[in-house]
UniProtKB/Swiss-Prot annotation:
Sorted UniProt keywords: Chloroplast, Plastid, Ribonucleoprotein, Ribosomal protein, RNA-binding, rRNA-binding
Known role: One of the primary rRNA binding proteins, it binds directly to 16S rRNA central domain where it helps coordinate assembly of the platform of the 30S subunit.
GO MF annotation: an example: rRNA binding
The name this protein goes by in its record: Small ribosomal subunit protein uS8c
Length: 133
């Protein structure tokens, strides 16, 4: 299946798997989705991920994280900000704080994908990919 917006596809698959309380979700692997998964793991939103397959059939297996006996998802919500039809950019002074710092914004900078906190610390701006809280 050909997908134009791989970032939105990844976020939708994670959102749907969270709602269904699935342990693992499969996402097509691109450089961007791998970088986003790395940041999500570093920030504690997912347990782990690994790249499977070869060539065009490469995909990521992302292990989702749940809390407590009731298995409440760690990821409450995901929201795509910059879309193919309307790109959203911000310099380091204009970077948003998600829920007063409780969530993160993923920013695509010249030094790769990072959180809004890291980009603000490094004095970098870039494209605001999504909000996660």
């Amino acid at each position: 299946m050909v997908v134009n917006d791989t970032i939105a596809d990844m976020l939708t698959r994670i959102r749907n798997a969270n709602l269904a309380r699935h342990q693992i979700v499969q996402v097509p692997a691109t450089k961007m989705t791998c970088n986003m998964a790395t940041v999500l793991k570093e920030e504690g939103f997912v347990q782990n991920f690994e790249q499977m397959g070869e060539g065009i059939e490469t995909h990521l297996m992302i292990s989702l994280k749940y809390n407590g006996k009731n298995r409440q998802p760690v990821i409450t919500a995901l929201k795509r900000i910059s879309k193919p039809g309307l790109r959203v950019y911000a310099n380091h002074k204009e970077l948003p704080r998600v829920l007063g710092g409780l969530g993160i914004a993923l920013i695509s900078t010249s030094r790769g994908v990072m959180t809004d906190r890291q980009a603000r610390h490094d004095g970098l701006g870039g494209e605001i990919l999504c909000y996660i809280w």
